[in-house]
């Protein structure tokens, strides 16, 4: 495992994050096994949201920490807020009162006095930056949140928040993986008249690198939010075969090879993996033992149907 500083602020974070969205689907003994395995291989950073399983993922995480007698200071806990009424009238809410009440709820479920990181989940079109700033300052001054960041936001959305928020925004969660590369496509096709040249995210990758914001890639094995795993998608047969071949060459698991491809990018990303399988978690850490050559990295990129200009 390698360790990093998130956003030039939070030191000692594992470069691999365990995503806890599906934690609630497993029984208490399985959850303990997952957490113990993660810590055993060096993962100390855990990602949550107040909406994952209606808050039950946070609660089960806390129960597992207690059962396994894992000290709070051995883990870095990140949670997210801003999504409301997910199963009824789904919408976004970055109001001061809702941010504070969401954090209070997460702290109670997680049985902790503080979050290491709080992220705003998806952009709220009705956001009032001053409201967010007041919420963040109140939470920070009370010692309830150490650091702050965002999720799925473009450069101007971040700029708008940072204009009022006094704390640095240290992370931005964005989907990224071999089958989901809009962060790369536009830059590689600059000045070209093809669909890949369309800038869809405001050049967020370069922006985050310039402003010391750590990108946390989510769902690295998926096509997008609604199309499932790329390994099961007929459009990505060549990509899957290429990755399997390289995994064999480098003598690592398929999952480790995918993560190695992400980690090869010099942006120092911090990928999120959501596996609840201890054996698979162990195998993923081998991603840090290899470094893809430029030729191999680009071959994987092209095998997903991305021609170079």
Predicted regions, residues:
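N-terminal binding-site loop/beta-alpha segment at the start of enzyme catalytic domains
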Residues: 1-75, 141, 222-224
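Beta/alpha (TIM)-barrel catalytic core signal, keyed to glycine-rich beta->alpha loops juxtaposed to Asp/Glu
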Residues: 129-309
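Acidic-and-aromatic substrate-binding clefts and catalytic sites of carbohydrate-active enzymes
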Residues: 23-29, 49-59, 124-128, 151, ...
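Structural motif corresponding to the early beta-alpha repeats
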Residues: 68-96, 121-122
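Active-site mouth loops of central-metabolism enzymes
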Residues: 19-29, 87-97, 126
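Active-site groove signature of glycoside hydrolases
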Residues: 108-128
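Short, acidic/polar
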Residues: 26-38, 94-109, 156-159
């Amino acid at each position: 495992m390698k360790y990093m500083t998130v956003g030039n602020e939070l030191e000692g974070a594992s470069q691999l994050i365990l995503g806890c969205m599906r934690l609630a689907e497993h029984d208490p003994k399985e959850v303990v096994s997952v957490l113990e395995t993660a810590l055993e291989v060096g993962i100390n950073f855990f990602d949550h949201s107040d909406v994952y399983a209606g808050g039950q993922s946070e609660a089960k995480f806390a129960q597992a920490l207690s059962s396994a007698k894992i000290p709070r200071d051995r883990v870095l806990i990140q949670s997210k807020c801003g999504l409301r009424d997910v199963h009824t009238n789904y919408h976004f809410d970055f109001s001061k009162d809702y941010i504070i009440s969401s954090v209070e709820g997460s702290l109670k479920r997680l049985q902790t006095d503080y979050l290491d990181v709080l992220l705003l989940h998806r952009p709220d079109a009705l956001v009032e930056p001053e409201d967010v700033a007041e919420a963040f300052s109140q939470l920070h001054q009370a010692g309830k949140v150490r650091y702050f960041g965002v999720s799925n936001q473009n450069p101007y959305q971040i700029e708008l928040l940072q204009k009022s928020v006094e704390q640095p925004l240290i992370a931005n969660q964005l989907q990224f993986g071999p089958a989901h590369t809009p962060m790369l496509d536009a830059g590689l096709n600059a000045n070209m008249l093809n669909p890949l040249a369309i800038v869809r995210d405001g050049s967020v990758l370069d922006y985050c690198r310039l402003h010391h914001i750590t990108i946390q890639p989510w769902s690295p094995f998926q096509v997008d939010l609604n199309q499932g795993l790329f390994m099961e998608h007929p459009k990505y047969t060549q990509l899957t075969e290429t990755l399997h071949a390289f995994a064999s060459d480098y003598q690592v698991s398929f999952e480790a090879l995918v993560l190695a491809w992400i980690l090869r990018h010099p942006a120092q990303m911090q990928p999120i993996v959501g596996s609840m399988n201890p054996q698979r978690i162990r195998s993923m850490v081998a991603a840090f033992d290899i470094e893809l050559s430029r030729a191999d990295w680009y071959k994987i990129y092209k095998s997903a149907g991305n021609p170079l200009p």
